[in-house]
Amino acid sequence: STHCISSAASDVYKRQGIMNKETKRKREEMDYTIEEKEMFMREALKEAEFALANDEIPIGCVLVKNGQIIGRGHNAREELQRAVMHAEIMAIEEANQQENSWRLLDTTLFVTIEPCVMCSGAIGLARIPKVIYGAKNQKFGAGGSLYDILTDERLNHRVEVESGLLEEECAAIMQNFFRNRRKK
């Protein structure tokens, strides 16, 4: 009888080992080199430039799966007169359509500024496993600065977070925008 339990437990452990290898393989597919990460963040910065050209708060975002951009977004609240039109929301929406799924598993979201509470919630709901952002958002950040929604253990989906990628460039576009806005 003990042997059967051990054998059954052994089978479970073997299956878990296989699942762990599969999970590890998937995670490795999302581990980009620093050059690749910088390339994707530069694409997010291009999106921020689009926002800036439209006199929007210059935040940009790209969502990447298997090394391909599947969603892009930039702030468009003023243009569309919709409060929820943040860069992350637009990128998630585009990726949902591209993938024909609300689940954006095996993706990495690159955004120039730390996501706010709303966007962090959307990231969790979309099951995005990894977020890489440029500069912290001390006033609205929900990825570790003001709040920590992305990694909160009380929630059923936690996100791996990296910060500080091209931080100076990401912060500079925001600082210049607000400096110029105060002059008006």
Please state what every model-predicted region is.
Residues 20-54, 102, 115-184:
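Zinc-dependent deaminase
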Residues 34, 77-78:
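A short, polar/acidic, helix/strand-boundary loop motif
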Residues 55-59, 105:
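Short, basic and Ser/Thr-rich N-terminal targeting/leader segments
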Residues 59-67:
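Short beta-strand scaffold segments in enzyme catalytic cores
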Residues 70-77:
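Short beta->alpha transition motifs characteristic of CBS
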Residues 81-85, 89-122:
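Helix-adjacent hinge/juxtasegments
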